[in-house]
Amino acid sequence: MAIKAICRDCLWTGPDPAGPPDGRCPACGSRRIVADPELDQLSIAHMDCDAFYASVEKRDRPELRDRPVIVGGGKRGVVSTACYVARQYGVGSAMPMFKALKACPEAVVIKPDFTKYVFESQRILGALGQLTPLIQPLSLDEAWVDLSGTERLNGGPPAFQLIRFQKQIEDQTGLTVSIGLAPNRFLAKMASEMDKPRGFSVVGATNAQALLAPRPVTALPGVGPVFGK
């Protein structure tokens, strides 16, 4: 059976590229369904940990769960990572710390603990490496992966493997990752940023134009605000 739809909660699979008629998984009732006509054909993915440094700190300090958290240096430093609560105030990576604190005075600032981040990165990339050796890490918290030819070895098409990997990481580490699946690295990178956090987005040949046309040129990897003008 062709797999065109997958439930991200229970791993139910179905053949309809539109997903279940009512939008709910027939096995568990979840609405977290990934469905696409090319779902079982695409094999290039981009994996990106969600607000990685800040998420590690929040996991280790549950009392900060709903607080704005910034990981970075002192007042003269810059923001390494801002959690999603802090981002709602306009705080972003590489922002000078004094500007970040002006935008979000109640933020909890935590100095980076790279020993801890490297350890978690190795756990995540190690789990990804169990699927295929064709991994290209871009940093501690993101990587490209090519799952071509792994369907029989890993018990399902790349989309199924990656959704199962997402669940594994969340269950084992308490951290979440977002994944973009596409025919090439360029589109996979863009896809991974479309549904964060804890997202899974598919950009195939059939929907690439419709999905990308409304987005600004700065959404393209490597295109900054200056060049985008």
Question: What are the functions of these language-model segments?
Answer:
Residues 1-229:
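Gly/Gly-Pro- and Ser/Thr-rich, intrinsically disordered tail segments characteristic of DNA damage-repair
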